[in-house]
Amino acid sequence: MTTVGSGQAWTAQQGAYRAAVQRRVLAVLTAGQVLGGIGVGLGVAAGTLVARELSGSEVVGGLAQTSAVLGAALIAIPAARLSAGSGRRSALSFGYGMGTLGALVAALAAAFGSWPLFLAGLLLFGGASAAGYAARYSATDLSRPGHAARDLSIVVWASTGGAVLGPLLAGKTDALGGHTGVYLLATAVFALAALAVFVGLRPDPLRVAHLGSGREEIPPDRSLRTGLRVLGRSPSARVAVMAITVSHTAMVALMSMTPVHLDHGGAGLGTVGVVISLHIAGMYALSPLVGWFADQFGHVPVLLGGQVLLALAAVVAGLAAPESTAQAAVGLVLLGLGWSCGIVAGSALLTESAPVDLRPSVQGLSDLLMNGGAALGGVVAGVIVATLSYPALSALLLLLTLPMGTLLLLARRLAEP
């Protein structure tokens, strides 16, 4: 009786400790997401237009968002290794640190009028996005069973204020030097985000998650190959990664070229900033509701709903004339909602499909594939708009959602973990 009682007391103490740490983790991640969201929002609103202005080429303009997304993909690799070897705090601090350096380089490039240097800066700028994406997984390390999507969605939702405010601030930076000021402001907020997670994310949630298994140390040798093995063994993990990748690729491709499309209709940076802010609100604002639906009704149905929303977004935005700012905004809000369904439900499904000690590897692999696909999508989007049209890009994205939707219909027969 004494042994059983002692064991129950220890379990209760451990549960209370994990719950207390989880509350702190969510608070710190929320602060980091708000700050990081401001910087990323600034870059999203201005990047395409600045690159096009510096180069005089719409193709190079499309490469701006592609560079940032490619940077996020590349930085996800060392970030995943840091998570596996040192914990979430090191990985997130590294990502925001790279974003700080990249924003500073982009500011200097805008000041000196060098578009190659600007694109190089945006590669590093993508580190902040990589940190933001990794933060959503950090929120699930200590989640109670059946609550991963809700905890994850809180961190995604935390990006709303910053990400909506960022594009709006992009049109108010004349006093800081116009385009240069946009990236100087991003430099400052990324530095604050790095400081917040470095100081505040103690104890590390991934280390605490290993307490229940009797191992306080994080297994040190976890590569992306480990993530591939997880995908090979788990059908639900494969479905999750595919849905995440398609959702993010479609979102980046359409969103990155919408500012150029609206610019052809005479829209200024302020108007574009409002449209992008509405889009980002669609991405983040309803994510807690998306997370609740995913936990209550299953991940796959929410993923399927996300593909339907992405298809509707492609139709609405694709039919918008360059002067139709309102219609384009509606299309981008739908695009954001579809993305939210894909990222929240897909990330939760992936997390629950892998053991805790293998999660950093498969999560890092997912972010690599997600951002790599989006980078390719951004390149293709720029070429399609330059050689064909914005409606042609929308039609291609509509076709992209059809096979993924079909796969998800079939995947509903799979038992979720």
Question: What is each of the regions a protein language model found here?
Answer:
Residues 34, 115-130, 327-341:
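Hydrophobic core of transmembrane alpha-helices in multi-pass small-molecule transporters
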Residues 47, 130-143, 341-354:
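Intracellular juxtamembrane helix-capping segments at the cytosolic ends
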Residues 75-88, 174, 285-299, 385:
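Helix-to-loop junctions at the C-terminal end of transmembrane segments
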Residues 97-112, 309-322:
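C-terminal ends and interior cores of transmembrane alpha-helices
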Residues 112-117, 145, 155-201:
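Helix-loop-helix hairpin linking two adjacent transmembrane segments in secondary transporters
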Residues 121-158:
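Cytoplasmic helix-loop-helix junction between adjacent transmembrane helices
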Residues 187-212, 407-412:
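C-terminal membrane-cytosol helix-exit motif in multi-pass small-molecule transporters
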